[in-house]
Amino acid sequence: PNSNIELVLSKAADVIPYVEHGVCDMGVVGKDTIMEKGGSFYETLDLGFGKCRFCLCGKKGEDFYAGYHTRTIASKYPKVTRDFFSRKNMDVNIIKIEGSVELAPLLGLADAIVDIVETGTTLKENGLEPYETVAPISARVIVNLASMKLKKQQIQALTEQLQEGLRAKDEAKKQEAKKAESKQDK
């Protein structure tokens, strides 16, 4: 009620610079953008929506890890891809693709892709399958470093309100599921 919250709508890629540079105190952005762009901010809350995952994907039935050759990976997310294969101590060539990444293995451009997978329908339609999950993704709250110090009380209060809203939503879903289950039992 006595809040002076101002909302700014922007593209996901712009949320981080707005928060980092203090134009906005807080922002909501996907973990995919955080992992790819990085930056100086606090990641304070997983909002639990927009859930999907980064996956290593390729042609159905192929053994991606067979053999010892350097693989070529296509992705819109070269940093995420590089970090993933670095953790596995694997040398890969990464090709940044902006559009339909799933075409790269089909056209012989890449051995596999690293991309966001929600349902897997697009992969199936293109004869691909997920080989491995790289990282889970969902919407996150980020906070400017200076704002966290200067406006800590307000930011904590808003974060707690968001958490309470998420808990209430989860509880409502559980109640709805129980009602549906009891109707089926009758």
Predicted segment positions?
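Domain-level signature for soluble enzymes in the chorismate/prephenate branch of the shikimate pathway
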Residues: 1-186
